[in-house]
């Protein structure tokens, strides 16, 4: 009996063990299948998983090799690889020095697959991996080198030079262009066969561009469009024969050698005025480039051996190319971006703002609208001071904007700032010597500002930081603005975000007081004398710079840089900047209000902001073409200059005044950051 029980117990134990083993095996298969679905991303944060997935897909798609439909590449793949055709798309490319030096890694051209190609393009648009903006940049080098073809570059791009040139910090900047299949269908433009490019001309030569396409200068930090009606003049720093803004001989000597490109003045030709250019919907830069191309074709230069292209690029040391922000604040805050990509996007936006301030400083006196101009071709930001004083509508708009800005600055002072920021010093030696004469101080201020602009455009941030600090000690608004942005991102210094915010707030306060004083004094003396052209130019320049500073203050509040994060106040500052006339702020405000990311959606206000940005050359997104419907149009008073813009700005100011009651409520707790800024007072 006991033997039978023991045998039965042994059989049951064996059966249970077998069942457990089978269940364990099935469970392992399930875990393996689940692991294959997770692809190794389990346990990671969402951003890390996205970054890892982006890297793996880049390797599978072999983004650094050229995609091609040619039968030669397919035949090479069939000969050099063994296995099924489905394994051809799984060939990985080395992405590190260890993988590059490995003898077991096979690098061959990847078979073009439409589905994988669109996945690659989507990843590139999300993560911003390729550092090229369009296909024209890809052929900049090949246009200057007639014996070099794009395919030759990829044939010589083997694993050895990957291992030598790989750098984690410059990885995304050193990637090759996206492997678009249409690159093989386009023949790159080549230079003339009878001339050979010099080593210095390879970087500056540009291909022949298609018609109605603006010329550009390739630069990592150059912005897009700042002032669409900007006209080059011989009085600015952009020309080789030009004189700097200051009367200093030392700055003249330094700035004379900054550019060798020719600059054609447009002031003598009445057909090239701002109103005519805006009516024809073309920029003055294009007209000047076309004229230079025509003159060069009629009278060829005998001194130059290389042919002169129709679009002669302007030296980057002379003046930044006019561009606008290429990425919005919402895109820079996207959770799908890695930290390094966010930092690069924010730094690029800051460089665009700095270049915009330089263009405002150098170009504003060239593009002022004529007096008593009642045409819609004149921009709202360029209306002369005389017209603003003579028109009750324009005068009331400026008074309302000044009042709204003063209310916002006082609200920031009461709720966020606990130090006296008006005593901030910028230079290494503090404020200027009081014993010096005012003329000498003015000379030194302009001298330091011109040198700071020169070194910034040469990417010499150390010298630019020092000269902007010295110029800001003499209360120069442009230099103080650039100095504050340098402090915010730690260019040539350690990052000091709170001190940077105080510098921006100080500059905004001083500019606002200057605008109020200028408008009041001009209004009182209007019966006796009229405002001269210089005063009108300075007024418009200060208006544009104040709009740019308000936009950067809104960026600080949106990101929480050096101040407590307040997205509602950030949106209010951005909308206020758009009302002053900043094109980037107008586009950003329209985007925020159309999406309802911060506050409730307001389609009418979004349409008004989008239309204002459209007047300055920034079209709304493709999905926002509804802003041009007739129900979003306003009746314009054509007795004032820029009648359509004035109608939209008036509606925006009324909306801002109705929503500014929040800023007169009980103050909140201040940000206690006295320790971080007391030694800069």
UniProtKB/Swiss-Prot annotation:
Keywords: Cell cycle, Cell division, Cytoplasm, Mitosis, Phosphoprotein, Repeat. It comes from Schizosaccharomyces pombe (strain 972 / ATCC 24843) (Fission yeast). The keyword Membrane does not apply. Functions as a negative regulator of mitosis. It interacts with the C-terminal of nim1, thereby inhibiting its kinase activity which phosphorylates wee1. Sel1-like repeats lie at residues 547-582, 583-618. The keyword GTP-binding does not apply. Residues 92-103, 238-278 have a biased composition (Low complexity). Residues 22-43, 80-104, 182-324 are annotated as: Disordered. Residues 191-203 have a biased composition (Polar residues). Gene3D superfamilies: Tetratricopeptide repeat domain. It is found in: Cytoplasm. The modification Phosphoserine is found at residues 70, 196. One of its GO terms (biological process) is signaling. One of its GO terms (cellular component) is cell tip. Residues 23-37, 296-306 have a biased composition (Basic and acidic residues). This is Mitosis inhibitor nif1. One of its GO terms (molecular function) is protein kinase inhibitor activity.
